[in-house]
Structures are given as structure tokens and as C-alpha cells.
Design a protein with these regions (language model features):
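Mature extracytoplasmic/periplasmic domains
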Residues: 35, 286, 290, 295-355
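A ligand-binding cleft/hinge motif common to bilobed small-molecule-binding domains
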Residues: 98-103, 260-275
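Early extracytoplasmic/lumenal segment of secretory-pathway proteins
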Residues: 36-102
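Conserved C-terminal helix/tail region of periplasmic/extracytoplasmic solute-binding proteins
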Residues: 351-382
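Extracytoplasmic ligand-binding site segments that recognize negatively charged/polar headgroups
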Residues: 75, 96-238, 242-246
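Paired acidic/hydrophobic, glycine-rich loop segments that form the ligand-binding mouth/hinge
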Residues: 89-94, 240, 257-262
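Periplasmic-binding protein-like
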Residues: 224-233, 272-296
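N-terminal secretory signal peptides
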Residues: 1-11, 18-22, 26
Length: 382
């Protein structure tokens, strides 16, 4: 993949768009529900994705009342939908690699997307294409539409790690003596980040952590060594986090000076305190894609498609990026995201580190439960 210079979100994501242009067709002729003056849509979403300015715009533009419920992890969302038998919500936002986990016995809890009703042509073609491999298609049906993408990388206090240039940033900073008692991380993610660090150092061979998806034996071989390294450095544990608020609090209230965080956390911290920097580590930023899906028991389908189409509008998608720092999968969103967004993107990303991103893979049958065992080992060591 090649990149224009200077690099932008748009130039990076549109690479390969010509070869996948067919994905933008057929043109969407209708926008069911959009602009109607009544109805309700029940949305279950990550806590910071749909903020008040987006709610106000949606309700004003459509006349549809938006009932918002939020969650902080894929596990929480999956468990909630399984408990309700797929009912109670019209829209949910699963990470695309987590979509397969909505299989509940013989029932799949997400329904096929009617691509004649959703403005899928607004999605960046390469993102729409790549989402297939990541899990958006199940049992031959597309069940998820790309919504946004982002990274989980390293946030650090540059006054503590004085002299550290962008090329020096590493997941290993969490285990540096300078971060003693002040390292923040999500346990499931630190297994990957530290694994990438140890792989790069030649201490744990893992095929850049892809072996943990290969087989249960390989997963345990790698995670055993990575978890042992983390536990051996438990004096650096400062704060665990499982959602955006907890990650912010780790730095703002608990005094952490280094951590693995989502991009939204790192960029928001940087806006308030410039010495806190969010950067891609040399081992590669961990990358995810979230999506929009319709639960099998959704009751308000017209309103659900109206909501999807509103989120796929470049202006609305730009609001999401400006609010959160996350990157939209909608073509044209970046032009509506504002100067702060553009500036921070240029500070964090370049052609080299974008080419070095590490993508979360679709969960394999043994992965989630096996990973949880090592999460528990780390948690219990604190």
C-alpha cells in the first residue's frame, strides 16, 4: 500500500478504493425511514460514540426519538443480547471481529443487512471489503456495516520519558522503571501489546502475535510466557481499565505516566495536557473496526435503517470523529471533523506506522475463553 504525502486519514483509507469501487454499487435509491416524523429507535452503543450533538441532529432531521443505552465492552454487549434473545434493541455496535460471538446455540442474534436499504455506498470501499475477512459476513450474509476504526497504542508523559522521540515509543515503556506503580492498561490488550514487544525483542516467538489465533496450543505457549513477564513486572501496575472513562481516570486521577490506551483516550488527554502524548509504538499500533448491526429481535426496522443512514452521512460521521478522535469508515467524514482532528492525526500517524498496524483478528473458538484465563492471572497478581 502506498500513501500520498502528506498523509491523511482519507488518503490512507482510500488506498485500493479503485479496485474495490464495485462495492459502492448499486446506488441506494431509497432511505427508508429517513425524514419520517414519528417512531422510536433503541440504540445500544459504546459509551462515547453517539453524543448529544449527534442525537440532536438525528432527532431534528428525522423526527425519530432515539433511546440510547451504552456499554463498555464487547463482552457486555454480547451477554446482554444473549440474555434477551436478541430483543430490546434495534441497533448495536459490535467490533467486527466479535460478530461471530453473537451465535447463541442454533440462533444467530444479528439479522442480515438489506443492502438496498442502507447507504453502504457511503462506506470507504476498502473498509467495506476488508470487513468481510474480519467478520462482517456470517453464514453467507452481511450482518455488520463498518462504522469506525481506531487504534490502541501508547500514551505517555513526555516529561517523565524525557527525550523519547516518536521512533522510541514502545509497549515496553509500560515496564520501564520510570513507570513503577504508574502503568495503565486493559488486561486483555496488554497481553497483545507486551507480546508484540517481546516478539520484537526476540524473547517470545509468536509470528507477531498471530500465533495466538492459530491453535489453542500455540495460544497457550505464547500467552504463558507473556503473562509471566507481565506478572513479573507487577510493581509497575498502576490502573486497570475496561472503558474510556476508566482509561481517562487512570491518568487524570491515578497519576499514571504510561499506558496502553485507545486513541480517543490519548487524544483527549493530549488536548487537556499536551505533555501527555499518544503515539504508535515501533512494534505496531493495535487496530480495530467497529460496526453497526441490527439484532434479530429488532422491532423498529424502518427506524433502524434511518439511524444507519444518518450515521453514514459524512456530516454526522464527521461529528463522531470530532467528538471522539475515532476515525470514521464513511467517505468524506474527515472533511467534516474539524482542525483539531486533522492536527492530531498528523501528529500521531505517518506512512510508516500506518503500514505497520496490527489488526485484531476474528475470534477463534478457543481464543476468548483462553485469553480470559490469562486476564484473570494478571488481575489476581495485582
Amino acid at each position: 500500500m502506498t500513501f500520498a504525502n502528506p498523509i491523511t486519514r482519507r488518503s490512507m483509507l482510500k488506498a485500493g478504493a479503485a479496485s474495490a469501487a464495485f462495492l459502492a454499487a448499486p446506488a441506494i435509491l431509497t432511505r427508508p425511514g429517513f425524514g419520517q416524523s414519528s417512531g422510536t429507535v433503541n440504540v445500544f452503543v459504546w459509551g462515547d460514540y453517539v453524543q448529544q450533538n449527534m442525537i440532536d441532529k438525528f432527532q431534528k432531521d428525522t423526527g425519530i426519538k432515539l433511546n440510547l443505552s451504552t456499554y463498555g465492552s464487547n463482552d457486555e454487549a454480547t451477554q446482554k443480547l444473549k440474555a434477551s434473545g436478541g430483543k430490546g434493541f434495534d441497533i448495536i455496535f459490535p467490533s467486527v471481529t466479535n460478530v461471530a460471538n453473537y451465535q447463541d446455540g442454533d440462533t444467530f442474534l444479528l439479522q442480515p443487512i438489506d443492502e438496498t436499504k442502507a447507504k453502504v455506498g457511503n462506506v470507504i470501499p476498502s473498509m467495506y471489503r476488508d470487513s468481510i475477512q474480519l467478520g462482517a459476513v456470517q453464514n453467507g450474509d452481511r450482518v455488520a456495516i463498518p462504522f469506525n476504526w481506531g487504534t490502541e497504542a501508547v500514551t505517555f508523559d513526555s516529561t517523565v520519558f524525557e527525550g523519547a522521540g516518536d521512533a522510541d515509543v514502545s509497549y515496553g515503556m509500560l515496564w520501564d522503571p520510570k513507570a513503577k506503580g504508574k502503568a495503565a492498561f486493559r488486561q486483555k490488550s496488554v497481553l497483545i501489546g507486551t507480546g508484540l514487544y517481546l516478539d520484537a525483542m526476540g524473547e517470545v516467538q509468536s509470528n507477531r502475535m498471530l500465533d495466538v489465533y492459530k491453535s489453542e496450543e500455540d495460544m497457550r505457549r505464547v500467552f504463558d510466557k507473556v503473562a509471566s513477564y507481565i506478572v513479573d513486572h507487577r510493581e509497575n501496575f498502576g490502573a486497570f481499565w475496561n472503558n474510556a472513562t476508566e482509561a481517562l481516570n487512570a491518568f487524570q486521577q491515578s497519576g499514571c505516566v504510561a499506558g496502553q490506551t485507545w486513541d480517543s483516550t490519548g487524544l483527549l488527554l493530549n488536548r487537556d495536557k499536551p505533555e501527555l502524548k499518544y503515539r504508535m509504538p515501533k512494534e505496531g499500533g493495535m487496530t480495530w473496526m467497529d460496526s453497526m448491526a441490527i439484532p434479530s429481535g429488532a422491532e423498529n426496522l424502518d427506524q433502524a435503517y434511518a439511524f444507519i443512514n444518518a450515521m453514514l452521512d459524512p456530516e454526522m460521521a464527521g461529528l463522531m470523529s470530532a467528538n471522539t478522535g475515532y476515525n470514521s469508515c464513511v467517505d468524506g467524514a474527515a472533511a467534516n471533523a474539524g482542525e483539531v482532528y486533522a492536527r492530531q492525526f498528523a501528529e500521531v500517524y505517518n506512512a510508516d506506522n500506518l503500514a505497520n498496524l496490527w489488526w485484531w483478528q476474528p475470534d477463534t473458538p478457543f481464543f476468548a475463553s483462553g485469553q480470559q484465563e490469562y486476564v484473570d492471572r494478571i488481575t489476581n497478581a495485582s
